[in-house]
């Protein structure tokens, strides 16, 4: 009788817990996170008047969360989601789960270096590391007061061999050394928006060592001219996304750069906002990269006229275009083809976004009303013509 009573008190259902399979018992016991059953739950399993016994320690977590391979996949999934959402600190919550999750998360964090504070970057550079880190992603975000010596000191602890993405957002006073980029042959993405030090000489020296580069972001790098872009186009054949938009020194980027990119790489996204691109350059772009182009930014391109954008859209030279930016183009007045193109894409169920300034938006609305009236009047004219032909 006492043996049966002991079995009942120690049975899993007596505490309201799921039964752990025998094969998983060893793995659960070996888990570093083994919380004990609350006392009130354990006491509820005994009969009234019997001595209260403490329930044995049992794991509340599922056995799959103790498998390192599965934990690594989960942590990487969280890392990818936090990167897309722009919340790099979301991954830090995984550090607090248990020892296994902490170890896996630290390994993933060592592959992704993100700094939004210059003081923390200096602390990282001054800390004693056990060997060099080999991350895949290095991001510096809005470190406007960061000095070049601080960046050089930090990069001494970062090996470039496994580097895939290097992004320095609004870090105007620092520049990755050309020698460092020379050892980053696997780099896929280089983003230096708002950098005042990027020049043609830097691009000419660096692009030779970046044959696998796919994305180049040089927004607001107003010292770059056609010469630097031509060098990048001829040395980076896998390039598919280029952004050269700027507010100053637009005359340094002309149709020469656009033609070089069109002839040497297969562009999918091109941003030349504020550049002196002409109608001829846009025609060359459409002739070579028209089918592959998906996003095109032409804001503040003052030399474009009705002979390029409307005519090319009328000919469906960009069949897969989904984003078209046309703000502040003073010589663009005929927007009928633009409106028809947008209506055709919507009728086909294809996503399309055509952005314009206030003037162009007003022209779009007027042209849409005109087309609506013409479409409504067309059946009436056809019916009247049919009736007249029947009377004759």
Curated annotation (Swiss-Prot):
Keyword entries, A-Z: Cell cycle, Cell division, Cytoplasm, Mitosis, Nucleus
Primary location group: cytoplasm
Record-annotated disulphide pairs: none
Highest rank taxon of the organism: Eukaryota
Subcellular localization(s) per the UniProt record: Cytoplasm; Nucleus
Single Gene Ontology BP annotation: cell division
InterPro entries per UniProt: Leu-rich_rpt_Cys-con_subtyp (IPR006553), LRR_dom_sf (IPR032675)
A GO cellular component annotation in the UniProt record: nucleus
UniProt family annotation: Belongs to the AMN1 family.
Its job: Negative regulator of the mitotic exit network (MEN), required for multiple cell cycle checkpoints. Required for daughter cell separation and chromosome stability. Involved in copper sensitivity.
Record-given protein name: Antagonist of mitotic exit network protein 1
Native species: Eremothecium gossypii (strain ATCC 10895 / CBS 109.51 / FGSC 9923 / NRRL Y-1056) (Yeast)
């Amino acid at each position: 009788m006492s043996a049966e009573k002991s079995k009942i008190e120690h049975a899993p259902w007596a505490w309201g817990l799921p039964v752990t399979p025998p094969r998983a018992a060893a793995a659960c016991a070996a888990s570093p996170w083994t919380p004990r059953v609350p006392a009130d739950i354990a006491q509820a399993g005994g009969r009234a008047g019997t001595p209260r016994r403490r329930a044995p320690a049992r794991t509340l977590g599922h056995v799959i969360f103790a498998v390192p391979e599965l934990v690594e996949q989960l942590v990487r999934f969280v890392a990818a989601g936090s990167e897309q959402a722009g919340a790099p600190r979301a991954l830090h919550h995984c550090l607090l789960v248990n020892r296994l999750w902490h170890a896996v998360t630290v390994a993933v964090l060592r592959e992704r270096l993100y700094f939004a504070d210059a003081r923390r970057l200096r602390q990282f550079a001054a800390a004693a590391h056990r060997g060099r880190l080999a991350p895949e992603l290095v991001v510096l975000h809005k470190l406007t007061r960061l000095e070049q010596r601080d960046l050089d000191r930090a990069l001494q602890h970062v090996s470039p061999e496994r580097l895939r993405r290097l992004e320095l957002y609004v870090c105007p006073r620092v520049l990755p050394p050309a020698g460092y980029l020379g050892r980053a042959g696997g780099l896929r993405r280089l983003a230096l928006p708002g950098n005042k030090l990027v020049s043609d000489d830097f691009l000419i020296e660096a692009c030779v060592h970046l044959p696998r580069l796919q994305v180049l972001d040089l927004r607001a790098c107003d010292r770059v001219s056609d010469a630097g872009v031509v060098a990048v186009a001829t040395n980076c054949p896998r390039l598919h996304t280029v952004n050269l938009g700027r507010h100053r020194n637009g005359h340094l980027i002309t149709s020469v750069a656009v033609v070089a990119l069109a002839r040497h790489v297969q562009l999918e996204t091109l941003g030349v906002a504020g550049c002196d691109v002409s109608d001829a350059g846009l025609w060359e772009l459409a002739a070579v990269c028209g089918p592959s182009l998906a996003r095109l930014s032409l804001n503040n391109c003052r030399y474009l006229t009705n002979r390029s954008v409307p005519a090319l859209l009328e000919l469906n030279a960009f069949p897969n275009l989904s984003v078209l930016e046309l703000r502040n183009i003073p010589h663009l007045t005929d927007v009928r083809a633009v409106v028809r193109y947008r209506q055709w894409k919507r009728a086909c169920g294809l996503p399309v976004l055509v952005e314009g300034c206030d003037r162009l938006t007003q022209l779009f609305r007027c042209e849409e009303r005109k087309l609506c009236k013409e479409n409504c009047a067309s059946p009436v004219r056809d019916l009247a013509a049919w009736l007249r032909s029947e009377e004759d």
